[in-house]
């Protein structure tokens, strides 16, 4: 398979690139390194250094579209920039390789808004940030392309993804943020009282979901575990993995943050046979081990 990965130097993208290369696929990475890191890139992948806000052309069977402005707070402060990357960029991806399938990394957490029960794909999208609005718009473009052009593009609505190579500089990378602060002997920082909860899914499970839908249509599909963990519970789980006894520091809740986000993943289990395999405890252990190995000597 000839695969293109936008954002392929980033957290999820680079993990996907490694899996594609291990399968023997031909891989091109499209990245402008706004948040991606060159050290994440495999030399076996071809690099097209490009900003998706500008049109481009590639040869591909499948484009995994993971490039994004992924910070909710940035989207609140600079909605025009968020839309340029996440909406205009997605339109450019759709036009980059006519005939290629596009698999779009959408967002369950930012899209559904507050969840009383686990959100299914039929749950109305009620985004509470420009980031979530842009992801909804991207999904609409893919669905529209399918209707107009007969394509088989697919949107995957990710829960809160974590694991090796996650950037602690982005506010959505709470696991990386917590583990790095604990490694430095600093208190973790929780916005609000810690009762807010998220569905945390490990990056290798997310990569497998991307590979599972390649070549097939359908969707959209939620990608998560179906279980939520409070931020306070996450703090204690991270502290246990790091082997420290530490209490978090609390600050006021932030604009745009939601209280509960958890996804119903029964559709992708039923239609594609995908299910998350890595428990939170095991995923945190793997992430902590990677962090220890990645630290400079």
Model-identified regions with their sequence ranges:
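A conserved catalytic-core signature of glycosyltransferases
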Residues: 106-107, 114, 173, 196, ...
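Conserved donor sugar-nucleotide recognition element shared by glycan-biosynthetic enzymes
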Residues: 130, 138, 171, 231, ...
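C-terminal substrate-binding subdomain of Rossmann-fold SDR/epimerase-dehydratase oxidoreductases
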Residues: 182-297
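Hydrophobic alpha-helix immediately C-terminal to the catalytic Tyr-X-X-X-Lys motif of short-chain
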Residues: 137, 141, 145, 178, ...
